[in-house]
Swiss-Prot record:
MF-aspect GO terms: beta-glucosidase activity
Family as reported in the entry's similarity comment: Belongs to the glycosyl hydrolase 1 family.
Active site: E200 (proton donor), E417 (nucleophile)
Highest taxon in the source lineage: Eukaryota
Pfam families in UniProt: Glyco_hydro_1
The protein's name in its UniProt record: Beta-glucosidase 32
């Protein structure tokens, strides 16, 4: 009993002192909040240049491959494009206020290569107006207490480089990207401490060069009749190979740039799913899970950790997979301070016995069938809405983080994207979308699994970014899919409206404010009940 009385006194004293400092208690009656995570854990929202900025013909910007793709093949992007997008170029100051309003720590955005170097080449000159835009953006973020988290390349290479030499199909891209990255470090490095080189090389290589459903829209004709040219059996491997070498070249520049602070970090952003066996009793389906993870993660992470591609991919792809020289392998190995993980969903996988070897392509090299249901007909998620693009499977995030921890030496990780989609088919009102209950549940459940991965499993995760701040241009889906914490009214001047998920994050991330008496009572009660009677 004496110990309980002492504990009660200590609790009340701590509560009173904390309240006097203008802070709420570090423990909460809610299941989860900011203080459920380690000190200095980074919470933020994510975006990208083409999906947000608009102003494609303003400020000296030249066309990117996405400008060309959306205008040449509008039917492949829902008849939409990023010409205006959500007009972030003109509205960034107001949008930064929205980030601050939610108590976010950081804002992840990408640099438009064609806005900074219109020809793609540093030797051809710099667009000063484009550089100034990003300097203004960075300054505005810092002024509002928000940390800039910069991605150098998010899929929007200048069209000029593709016209000249095929962009990432050519090793010439390595030096052009090196020069672009070095310029960015020199111009912005004194105010930016968190950098990533590339966003989702898997999606960029596979969707752009195997399936052809995203820019640059290349693939074998038999894969997608809309593709004008391409080779789905070789080009995805070649593009990722050159991309990895460009990444390593950029990291070399980062580590010798005198404008970069000593505590600055650089990484790359990967986008793996988690996988479960289609048939839990099938050994071949269990092996298929490992193979899926090797192709989805190991293809790009193994070279950075171990200096080479996984043996599984080398065996399967054979001479269609380029090889690294010894020097390149050494340059790649450990060329990161952290790994960004974009996690959204999971799939069931089964071993595929029926692969047409006469028509090689990256997707069939995996010898996998990706499925939405398992053998019993159960979905990976209880969310069985047929309009969903992504299915909620929070357990997959924890499993994925543990897989990376165990297989790749527990690297520092940031969850650089995690988000929930609403498909707008015209049958849902704005009010219903803003209610946003499912998005709140999605983030809450994923944060719970993330917290367990950190505190119970020892996964080295340092931050969590939601996709996205605003509804925006979602690539081949155009504006029909909404991921934002803020609703964008595309029919009424692109006005922004907070969804309930934005309000939920504001509460979840709250740092200050005196605790209410009821909260104080409940917190004391929780401590009291947790201490054994003596």
């Amino acid at each position: 009993m004496a110990i309980k009385l002492i504990a009660l006194v200590i609790t009340i004293c701590v509560a009173s002192w904390d309240s006097a400092q203008g802070r709420s208690l570090r423990f909460s009656t809610t299941p989860l909040n900011r203080y459920s995570f380690p000190p200095h854990f980074d919470f933020g929202v994510a975006s990208s240049a083409y999906q947000y900025e608009g102003a494609v013909e303003e400020g000296g910007r030249s066309p990117s491959i996405w400008d060309n793709f959306t205008h040449a093949f509008p039917e492949r992007t829902n008849m939409d494009n990023g010409d205006v997008a959500v007009d972030f170029y003109h509205r960034y100051k107001d949008d930064i206020k929205l980030i601050k309003e939610m108590n976010m720590d950081s804002f992840r955005f990408s640099l438009s290569w064609s806005r900074i170097l219109p020809s793609g080449k540093l030797s051809d000159g710099v667009n000063k107006e484009g550089v100034q835009f990003y300097k203004n953006l960075i300054d505005e973020l810092i002024k509002n207490g928000i940390k800039p988290f910069v991605t150098i390349y998010h899929w929007d290479i200048p069209q000029a480089l593709d016209d000249e030499y095929g962009s990432f199909l050519s090793p010439r891209i390595i030096d052009d990207f090196r020069n672009f990255a070095r310029f960015c470090f020199q111009e912005f490095g004194d105010k930016v401490s968190m950098w990533t080189t590339f966003n989702e090389p898997y999606v960029y290589s596979v969707s752009g060069y195997d399936a052809g459903n995203k820019a640059i829209g290349r693939c074998s004709k038999w894969v997608n009749s809309l593709c004008i040219a391409g080779d789905s059996g070789t080009e995805p491997y070649l593009v990722s190979h050159n991309l990895l070498l460009a990444h390593a070249a950029a990291v070399e520049e980062f580590r010798k740039c005198d404008k970069i602070s000593q505590d600055a970090k650089i990484g790359i952003v990967l986008s793996p799913y988690w996988f479960e066996p289609y048939d839990i009793d099938s050994e071949s389906d269990k092996e298929a899970v490992e193979r899926a993870l090797v192709f989805n993660i190991g293809w790009h992470l193994s070279p950075l950790v171990f200096g080479d591609y996984p043996e599984t991919i080398k065996t399967t792809a054979g001479n269609r997979l380029p090889s690294f020289t010894k020097e390149q392998s050494m340059m790649l190995q450990n060329s990161f301070d952290f790994i960004g993980i974009n996690y959204y969903t999971a799939r069931f996988v089964a071993h595929d016995l029926h692969v047409d070897l006469s028509r090689p392509r990256f997707t069939t090299d995996q010898h996998l069938q990706y499925k939405l249901t398992n053998r019993s007909g159960d979905h990976i998620s209880s969310e069985s809405d047929g309009t969903k693009i992504l299915w909620s499977y929070p357990e997959g995030l924890r499993k994925l983080l543990n897989y990376i921890k165990n297989k790749y030496n527990n690297p520092t990780i940031y969850i650089t994207e995690n988000g929930f989609d609403d498909y707008e088919n015209g049958s849902v009102t704005r009010e219903e979308i803003i209610e946003d209950t499912k998005r709140i549940e999605y983030h809450q459940n994923h944060l719970q699994q993330l917290q367990k991965a950190i505190t119970e499993d020892g996964c080295n995760v340092k931050g969590y970014f939601t996709w996205s701040l605003l509804d925006n241009f979602e690539w081949e889906h155009g504006y029909a899919v909404r991921f934002g914490l803020y609703y964008v009214d595309y029919k009424n001047g692109l006005s922004r409206h907070a969804k309930n998920s934005a309000k939920w994050f504001k509460h979840f991330l709250q740092r200050s404010g005196k605790p209410m008496p009821l909260d104080l009572f409940k917190s004391v009660k929780n401590w009291w009940s947790a201490i054994p009677m003596i």
